[in-house]
Amino acid sequence: MESYRRVKGYEFEFVDQGPDDRFYQCRGDVYYDDEHDEIPEPGLWEAALQLEQQLKDEGYVADANHSEKGWVEVCLL
């Protein structure tokens, strides 16, 4: 697995915390929706979805999601 992947100008770092906890992560700016909930930076979210598809095309089971403080993750399931 590559240590880093660049997608749409965003650099995703690979984190391996064991066989059940492997993912790519990247942090962007924090945005808020109309209900004042944190959401990921729009361009970064698009990049995460693109990375998810790239990993699926390579045969991995992948899922893009986001957490707080601008972080997005693409988990390998």
Annotate each predicted stretch with a short phrase.
Residues 15-72:
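Acidic, low-complexity, intrinsically disordered interaction modules
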Residues 1-21:
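Short, extreme N-terminal segment that most often corresponds to the first beta-strand
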Residues 1-3, 71, 75-77:
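Short intrinsically disordered terminal tails
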